Amino acid sequence: MDIKKLQDYQKHIRNFSIVAHIDHGKSTIADRILELTDTVSERQMKNQLLDDMPLERQRGITIKLNSVEVKYHAKDGETYIFHLIDTPGHVDFSYEVSRSLAACEGALLVVDATQGVQAQTLANTYLAIDDDLEILPVINKIDLPSADPEMCKNEIEEMIGLDASDAVEVSGKTGQGIPELLEEIVKKVPAPDGDLNAPLKALIFDSKYDDYRGVVLSVRIEEGTVKPGDKIRIMNTGKEFEVTEVGVSSPHPVKKDMLIAGDVGYLTANIKSVRETRVGDTITSAETPTEKPLPGYRQIPPMVYSGMYPVDNQKYDDLKEALQKLQLNDAALEFEPETSQALGFGFRCGFLGLLHMDVVQERLEQEFGMDLIMTAPSVDYHAIMNDGSTKLIDNPADLPDAGEYKEVQEPYVKAEIMVPNDFVGPVMELCQRKRGEFVTMDYLDKYRVNVIYNMPLAEIIYDFFDELKSSTKGYASLDYEITGYRATDLVKIDMLLNKEPIDALSFIAHREEAQNRARQMTTMLKKLIPRQNFEVDIQGAIGAKIISRATIKPYRKDVTWKIHTGDPDRRAKLLEKQRRGKKRMKAVGRVEVPQDAFMAVLKMNDDDIKGK
């Protein structure tokens, strides 16, 4: 091993992430960089090349971080090794951004020249500043007629405090400005400085399961080197393995003889169980281990919970295995077994938001062929019991009876909404309607305002984002963070079918809205549950008090068609027999509840509740 050669190679490494608000063109810039450096041929090139998950291409968004090694021949005659990590822009996937940044020395801060700095631009920049990264401002979409690069530079300087006078102006669509951007990366992103002679220390920043190779770990080598045949130890679990392959993504896997300090690549080591590693763990040498592990990641708690059940109860174990494999690739997903009287055996899953929940459901259906029933999402409540203890409630059906607790607390968030001046009124009206408390309002410039509200998380996770977009014609952007729990007047509403509570349909609501929500729910269930051969009573109840009711009339068979004589006694006898049969059927008949009904709570927007 020629240390001088390796040190020279290390000096030419540049590790950087691309961060931005959703739809500001991160993936398009990544495409142009790959194209300009001849990393992919013209024949292989396609839009969103690094978004290799089918779901990402369907939705047109980045969901997973993705790394790629690029060789760039610079104007100084040297060849540089770029490790580029593309990141998501949606607030639900900010944990992917923080993991990407931990593997880098620099970050390209991409801002849309037509929209300027948005909520997630700020949030992601602060993550990069916390990691002490070199930040390069990049103004994208300068080819558009409405582009205003000077406005963007002023905003970056005023709102973020970065010098943007020499921000690179580019067009991800046409490739304009990309050569200048590559030169700026060489000049401004520092090379990694890890000690090549130190014991191996590597951070696992992502992982996935391969049916043939087992667990494939995405790693950033902080110190030392690693090659096939080396014995490694996962510091968190103490498990030891022998490395079978190391390499980089370019963008398809390319085997290498070794990875050195500063490299971002992958390794395999016959790790067969998904439980033996986790994202954020440190890998070291089993023979000469390092003393201290790397800091890893702050575990982000779920914000939204939902029940997940296989339509066929025989597939419970398949669902468990699929969730374990998915969790390897999605560190923020949490799940634990739960049982429902209505749906059988399943899992209570924790997500970072509704988009995250949708993505997990779609990935399970597309990648693992699962047929699922999902219950309506809920937040994590705290019930303060009479004895002073706190009970965590992530399933509304688990909330105890009213006499058993003193109060229920719900999570509150600080919501920051960036909005054009013209739409401040509708935004404030929407926030007030969602039980928001006004905090402050900052005028960012003569066109835009940052409105800050304290709001219950439960009001945000349903349809707040959709309503915000529709009331501002798509111009508003939202960022929020949990600030704590507050006692609120909340009640549990049970939905009963023929006097039997359906646990999966229970939900928690503010007392003032409880009756309207229960009425809306019964009306929806009446529409969604098909008619049966017997009458179905739908009721909403708080404890023993019925607060809403609807009835689904049964099918009625004409049992008198055989009577030709018009005998009234015979007719009455047949109808009475039919009535008795239906009554017996109602007592023993099981009402089949379709999947749509379990998601009905989601569809209860304010207009429905107010009966408009």
UniProtKB/Swiss-Prot annotation:
Residues forming the tr-type G domain are: 11-193
List the disulfide bonds in this chain: none
As for membrane topology, the entry says: Peripheral membrane protein
* Gene3D superfamilies per the UniProt record, alphabetical: 3.30.70.240, Elongation factor 4, C-terminal domain, Elongation Factor G (Translational Gtpase), domain 3, P-loop containing nucleotide triphosphate hydrolases, Translation factors
The alphabetical list of record keywords is: Cell membrane, GTP-binding, Hydrolase, Membrane, Nucleotide-binding, Protein biosynthesis
- Enumerate the catalysed reactions: GTP + H2O = GDP + phosphate + H(+)
Using the UniProt record, name the top-level EC class of this enzyme in a single word: hydrolase
Please give a single GO biological process term from the UniProt record: positive regulation of translation
Q: Which residues bind GTP?
A: 23-28, 140-143
GO molecular function terms listed in the Swiss-Prot or TrEMBL record:
GTP binding; GTPase activity; ribosome binding; translation elongation factor activity
Please give the superkingdom of this protein's source: Bacteria
Q: List the Pfam families hit by this protein, alphabetically.
A: EFG_C (PF00679), GTP_EFTU (PF00009), GTP_EFTU_D2 (PF03144), LepA_C (PF06421)
The terms describing its cellular component in GO are: plasma membrane
E.C. numbers: 3.6.5.n1
Protein localization: Cell membrane
What InterPro entries is this protein classified in? Answer: EF-4, EFG_III/V, EFG_V-like, EFTu-like_2, LepA_C_sf, LepA_CTD, LepA_IV, P-loop_NTPase
Q: Which family does it belong to?
A: Belongs to the TRAFAC class translation factor GTPase superfamily. Classic translation factor GTPase family. LepA subfamily.
* HAMAP family linked: LepA
Supply the PANTHER family for this chain. Answer: TRANSLATION FACTOR GUF1 HOMOLOG, CHLOROPLASTIC, TRANSLATION FACTOR GUF1-RELATED
| Main function | Required for accurate and efficient protein synthesis under certain stress conditions. May act as a fidelity factor of the translation reaction, by catalyzing a one-codon backward translocation of tRNAs on improperly translocated ribosomes. Back-translocation proceeds from a post-translocation (POST) complex to a pre-translocation (PRE) complex, thus giving elongation factor G a second chance to translocate the tRNAs correctly. Binds to ribosomes in a GTP-dependent manner.
Entry protein name: Elongation factor 4
Protein source organism:
Lactobacillus johnsonii (strain CNCM I-12250 / La1 / NCC 533)
